[in-house]
């Protein structure tokens, strides 16, 4: 059994101003665990800041979790002997993401997020997956028995790559989108019965692909929530919450009225369990992303990359303030990473949604495709919870997504960008003629070529 007071957590992306701060926060609040957090990042300055912030926090008398944060300049050194590995990286910079998201707009293609599917998600994967190939090899060589926790998008393809490269890896992907839908169901209960229900008390069965997940069951203390949800949907044809002011549309980057979820429920009889911004990118483009008027009518927003750049400036300021001595303020992150780590160490059990290879938990999707369902965490064990069959109409969408993701994974790892173009031109949001699709694809690759290891080979093929 592992020494829970002498653990090693390796963090790939340890200079993060987001996910890393969440982990620093949650480890500080947990009294049972201690050890070293090994920070590795190509952004060495960011990693060194997190090193000092984490150690300053651990030194405080009011902090329960005592950890030593240490920067490593080489990934092999960071991973050596690790019990857990956390991965949260930005593949490239926001300049590359700006191309992913906004270059397609010249062709009338709108993407609220652009990191999981669609033209942006596909090109992002071509940059990201070779990095994950390297991570998988490094994990195999330095800590093959470690549990690996991924937060990076495109989530499904990142996890799939880890298993393709190192089949024995013990990896899973975490996403908090389902939590938001549990909170929505809690609101439905509040509005309907004046009940105050923690989202954790709503028991759900989850099926799908990350960012395109659905609930096929939802219960609270044995009460079936589907009839209640159906009535609520019927009573709120325009969604819920305040309509987004068109004059301040760009200042509400994550808002939605859940109208897309409600519409998908009418189509499929299942409760969509991700943010509307993510859901729409997996659907045929004319449904929700036809044009700006359609987008506004469904009550969600497009998250501009300029907003992300501005947000990063703010995050860097907060980090710098903490680095210079301003006390780190603990908060409720809503994340379950530390609970998962504790369960894997044998300190209790937990059931929650994760992204792992399909071993039959979704009966009618391909074996080994990475799917999102519930899983049972216990001592050094992660077992998927059987989720059953997906109804044919919804499964048709899932099967297309799986096929696209498998194609893109193969293309990224072999450097066959022509194969990636096949997935690109087949994507339901790329509603373009062949020549326009080719021109868009080539322009997007050109804009991010610095991070594409096989770009020169692709150019030779074109010529």
PLM feature spans:
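Short acidic low-complexity segments
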Residues: 68-81
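Conserved NAD(P)H cofactor-binding loop of Rossmann-fold oxidoreductase domains
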Residues: 89-92
